[in-house]
Swiss-Prot record:
GO cellular component terms listed in the entry, alphabetical order: nucleus; plasma membrane
Compartmental location: Cell membrane; Nucleus
GO biological process: one example: neuron differentiation
Region Disordered, residue ranges: 59-101
Stated name of the protein: Vexin
Family indicated by similarity: Belongs to the vexin family.
Composition bias type Basic and acidic residues, residue spans: 59-70
Name of the gene: VXN
Coiled coil: none
The entry's keywords: Cell membrane, Membrane, Neurogenesis, Nucleus
Role noted for this protein: Required for neurogenesis in the neural plate and retina. Strongly cooperates with neural bHLH factors to promote neurogenesis.
């Protein structure tokens, strides 16, 4: 049976549909066949301000114009993945799990918003953990306020590793942690005013 989660307030509204993997519907086949087209990298805002140079890399089909001039595209060396060309600023949509043991044997289906197949968040590798006796404080070897802010907001991110964070979850897993953080943060600021459609609640 389909499971639909909704999470909304005055700024953002997320609808997520979860389809079991045993169902062989045409929608599931379309998701599976177009999986390679939906792969995108989503970066945390601090990665955009990281102190790394932006390099000009040539396309495969680019031709050389004159001596030493290439018509190419800009690419940040930090963003390396299957499709590093587009990076949406706000990660909203569904995600494909890396393995079947993520939340049982489930495959995530299409949502009502444009889907994002995988959301990869790279934790900064320039962080060093403080002594175990002190508080949970991260020391920056390179001074960057954005990296420090990111570690304060997301203390559970693994350091120096790539974490694949799915935005959907099944019934045993409960609501995903990122959506829960967004939901509780906005709920604390202002009370939600409006009607809730019970058709979009979890079954």
């Amino acid at each position: 049976m389909h499971q639909i989660y909704s999470c909304s307030d005055e700024n953002i509204e997320v609808f997520t549909t979860v389809i079991p993997s045993k169902v062989t519907s045409p929608a599931r086949r379309r998701v599976k066949s177009s999986q390679h087209l939906l792969t995108k990298n989503v970066v945390i805002e601090s990665d955009l301000y990281a102190p790394r140079p932006v390099e000009l890399l040539p396309h495969r089909t680019d031709r050389r114009d004159g001596e030493g001039r290439w018509s190419g595209r800009f690419q940040n060396p930090r963003l390396q993945g299957p499709h590093p060309a587009k990076t949406p600023a706000r990660p909203v949509g569904t995600s494909e799990p890396k393995s079947a043991n993520l939340c049982g044997n489930r495959t995530y289906g299409k949502a009502l918003m444009p889907p994002v197949a995988r959301i990869s968040v790279k934790a900064p590798t320039v962080l060093e953990a403080a002594a175990p006796g002190s508080e949970n404080v991260a020391v920056l070897t390179r001074g960057s306020r954005h990296l420090k802010k990111m570690t304060e907001e997301f203390p559970t991110l693994p350091q120096g590793a790539e974490a694949s964070l799915p935005l959907t979850g099944s019934a045993p897993c409960g609501m995903p942690s990122i959506l829960r953080k967004m939901w509780t943060r906005h709920k604390k600021k202002s009370e939600y005013v409006g009607a809730t459609n019970s058709a979009f609640e979890a079954d």
